[in-house]
């Protein structure tokens, strides 16, 4: 049976994960009148609203994911923490998954990611994988990994969690147990990202390079800005490396690749995620095709869309204010919406907590500097709080 919704009236696109990325994928699919089913463990998952079918269930449970996928003609992910074996079985039964389960097995584990980069000659910072924190401590006692270094949990990290820049022995001794890796610090000048889409027929589309500025304490993306500050040759090199990674993996769907740029201008692949990414949200307002629509197109055997930016843009995350946890209230939303060129996206999460991603805003302008100023003004006008009882 064809996997195109325009030739199969029974076509349903399955989205595994019902958070904000799932919600934006749902919107892209519904705009083309594609039926969507959503799987998520939370009863208040943002992506449940507007879905043709919503199912509650654990994303890491083999049977749950398998049975959900069997009711779909194509399956996409909004999160890596999904049972990859279920995806492999779905593919064996003729249901394409984006990404394939075999690719997910690599990318959902940072240690496997780094090993893959090294195996295929892709530039990445020097690293060592450890099965436990005790093994890392033993290696350090023998002289390896003097301070400072970067510690990463092999699994379970997101939005800055599971990554620590270790500067003191106290920090080193407080690291949690589990499979992990130690990584050398890059003499960092800039962090950038690239999204690449690839169809089952091998068609590819590469998005413009975006700059990422991080919050100094939350380790979350604070601003994403396009066009990049990188010289054109360096930006083209980042796009080529991202494309090489996609093709080396045999990935179909969407891959978001994060890079470090050192002070000598060298590019180092940091991490890759086989799904839409925070660094690509700007594409909703300022690109010919959004990252979400592009993944929907790839998963539905549709031609990929154009990736040219039609304006400068800056995206700022809307996160929970420190000291506030509970039912969410948005202070200053009207002020944000009154600003020219600023687009506000709220994800539908009912509860806020410090630094939780509750939404984002994107500012478009003629220049990157102006877009960033607008995004900063919008972010500063909005506070994500709880109301006093």
Mark where each language-model region is.
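ATP-binding N-terminal substructure of ATP-dependent carboxylate-amine bond-forming enzymes
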Residues: 1-115, 134
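Peripheral (often C-terminal) accessory segments that flank ATP-dependent C-N-forming ligase machineries
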Residues: 9, 297-389
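A conserved helix-loop-beta module that forms one wall/lid of the active-site cleft
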Residues: 99-163, 169
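Internal nucleotide-binding/catalytic subdomain
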Residues: 162-264
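Short, well-ordered beta-strand elements within core beta-sheets of diverse protein domains
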Residues: 184, 281-284, 361-364
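Active-site "cap" helix and flanking loop/linker of ATP-utilizing ligase/carboxylase catalytic domains
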Residues: 237-257, 263, 273-325
């Amino acid at each position: 049976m064809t996997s195109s919704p325009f030739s199969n009236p029974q076509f349903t696109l399955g989205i595994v994960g019902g958070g904000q990325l799932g919600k934006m994928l749902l919107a892209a699919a519904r705009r083309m009148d594609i039926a969507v089913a959503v799987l998520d463990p939370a009863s208040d998952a943002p992506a449940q609203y507007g879905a043709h079918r919503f199912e509650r269930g654990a994303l890491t449970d083999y049977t749950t994911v398998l049975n959900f996928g069997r009711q779909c003609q194509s399956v996409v992910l909004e999160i890596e923490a999904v049972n990859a074996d279920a995806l492999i079985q779905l593919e064996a039964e003729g249901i394409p998954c984006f990404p394939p389960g075999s690719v997910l097995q690599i990318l959902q584990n940072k240690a496997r990611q780094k090993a893959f980069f090294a195996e295929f000659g892709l530039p990445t910072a020097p690293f060592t994988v450890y099965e436990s924190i005790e093994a890392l401590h033993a290696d350090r006692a023998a002289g390896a990994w003097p301070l400072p270094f970067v510690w990463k949990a092999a699994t379970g990290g997101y939005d800055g969690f599971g990554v620590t820049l270790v500067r003191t022995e106290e920090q080193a001794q407080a690291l949690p147990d589990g499979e992990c890796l130690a990584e050398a610090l890059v003499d960092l000048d800039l962090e950038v990202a690239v999204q690449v889409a690839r169809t089952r027929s091998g068609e590819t589309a590469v998005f413009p390079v975006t700059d990422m500025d991080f919050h100094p304490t939350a380790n979350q993306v604070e601003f994403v800005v396009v066009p990049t500050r990188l010289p054109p040759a360096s930006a083209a090199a980042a796009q080529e490396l991202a494309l090489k990674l996609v093709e080396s993996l045999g990935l179909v769907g969407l891959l978001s690749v994060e890079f470090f740029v050192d002070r000598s201008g060298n590019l180092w692949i940091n991490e890759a995620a086989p799904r839409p990414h925070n660094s690509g949200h700007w594409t909703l307002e300022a690109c010919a095709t959004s990252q979400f629509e592009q993944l929907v197109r790839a998963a539905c055997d549709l031609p990929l869309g154009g990736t040219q930016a039609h304006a400068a843009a800056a995206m700022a995350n809307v996160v929970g204010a420190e000291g506030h946890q509970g039912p969410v209230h948005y202070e200053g939303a009207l002020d944000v919406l009154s600003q020219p060129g600023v687009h506000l996206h709220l994800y539908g999460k009912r509860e806020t907590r410090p630094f939780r991603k509750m939404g984002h805003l994107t500012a478009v302008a003629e220049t990157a500097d102006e877009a960033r100023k607008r995004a900063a003004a919008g972010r500063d006008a909005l506070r994500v709080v709880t109301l006093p009882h």
